[in-house]
Amino acid sequence: MRGLEKQGPSATAAPCGCAQPALETGNLLTEPIGYLESCFSAKIGTPRQPSICSQSRACLKIRKSIFNNPEHSLMGLEQFSHVWILFVFHKNGHLNYKAKVQPPRLNGAKTGVFSTRSPHRPNAIGLTLAKLEKVEGGAVYLSGIDMIHGTPVLDIKPYIADYDSPQNLEPQTKHHKLRAAGPSDATANSCDQQLLSGCEKAQPCHSTKEKPKCREHRTSDENSQKFRDTSEIQHTLPEDRERAVDLALESSREETMDEPEDQLGPQELKSFLEEGTDRPRKVEGALVLRGSSAETRWDASCHARTADRVPCSVVPSWVKEAPVATLQVRFTPHAEMDLRKLSSGGASQTSFKYFHSAEEAKCAIEAMLSADPRSVYRRKLCEDRLFFFTVDIAHVTCWFGDGFAEVLRIKLASEPVEVADPEESLVALGS
């Protein structure tokens, strides 16, 4: 009947009316694998994206209640440079959410919640790409983070550029595929019909097959080997020359041959060619088309194909050219003096826990303030108020002017500053 749709598995209701946890329905009870130890103690001032402040650092220790030997779960992770961190926005304050949100980057304009990274979502889950500094035992040390101290972490996944980063796609006319004629030709590349939103025209899906090396990327040994193989094959019979060229170009990738091809005599080479007529025709570096005298070489057109590629990752203009301008950051002489005193440490003073020096702490503060961490409310209605935040052990007080932010004072933060009501963190300028 019309109007009927296939329904998924229905959730089993508990006596209280709530849906019971079930893997098939997606109703899960999550358990954090650990709680983050971060240089950011509160939401105020924390970067909204991990790329804003590369100096920010954090440590995640895997809980022993998850694994008896946490270090076993991290085995092999040290071989990656970056990791995905899946976490919970545990400081939202409420579980309410709306279909449209006002991200600070849009300076008051509304857009759909799923087109943003707003923490107020149906499932308050965040995703961060962080740099992996090191792995020690059951602890992971990260940098370039945007999560606050005590954030519950749900999962860690390695970042793999070949899988996680969009690849440049080649126009369909540039694809050279050599296969036997048959009905499979019409359906072999069905993904070519997919459209990329924001691109000028349809592009074929990216193939995960290994692409041939460009000529300029080959080593001298590879080039000399191919030259010797090709020159020796010129003395073979004309009818076998096509297959001989195919063999020579393919020999660089064949690891099962008992002896190199340049040690074969003309008769041995001819007999070997006659035995391997059913060999696949796809080779690295070149393609020889049967029934045609022309040879289509991939490496010759590699540079031209690269110029014709169209990037498949498209973002709206408000992401790259946001209405909120980047601010200039300056420090008063007293603030710079406070920062040097704070980094000197001493017997009665605590030094930085996450930053390595005062200069690094200064760079982190500049990066955070240049992105304007204020909310839209504070930008429009609290322009004459001081703004302060905590990073590492530094409690920073600053104010914002027309296109700049100025750091007025930096003092030791005895305890993490966590303000429940945002209005409590506003102090009248001059008071």
Swiss-Prot record:
Keyword S-adenosyl-L-methionine listed: yes
InterPro entries: TrmO-like_N, UPF0066_cons_site, YaeB-like, YaeB-like_sf, YaeB_N_sf
Record's compositionally biased regions (Basic and acidic residues): 207-243
Domain TsaA-like: start-end pairs: 30-168
PROSITE patterns, per the entry: TSAA_1 (PS01318), TSAA_2 (PS51668)
Keyword vocabulary terms for this entry: Methyltransferase, RNA-binding, S-adenosyl-L-methionine, Transferase, tRNA processing
Catalytic activity annotation: N(6)-L-threonylcarbamoyladenosine(37) in tRNA + S-adenosyl-L-methionine = N(6)-methyl,N(6)-L-threonylcarbamoyladenosine(37) in tRNA + S-adenosyl-L-homocysteine + H(+)
Record-listed S-adenosyl-L-methionine binding positions: P47, R48, Q49, H90, K91, R117, L127, I148, H149, G150, T151
Annotated GO biological process: tRNA methylation
Chain spans, region Disordered: 167-189, 201-243
Enzyme Commission designation: 2.1.1.-
Pfam families in alphabetical order: TrmO_N
GO molecular function: RNA binding; tRNA (L-threonylcarbamoyladenosine(37)-C2) methyltransferase activity
Family as reported in the entry's similarity comment: Belongs to the tRNA methyltransferase O family.
Function of the protein: S-adenosyl-L-methionine-dependent methyltransferase responsible for the addition of the methyl group in the formation of N6-methyl-N6-threonylcarbamoyladenosine at position 37 (m(6)t(6)A37) of the tRNA anticodon loop of tRNA(Ser)(GCU). The methyl group of m(6)t(6)A37 may improve the efficiency of the tRNA decoding ability. May bind to tRNA.
Name the record gives this protein: tRNA (adenine(37)-N6)-methyltransferase
Origin species: Rattus norvegicus (Rat)
Annotated gene: Trmo
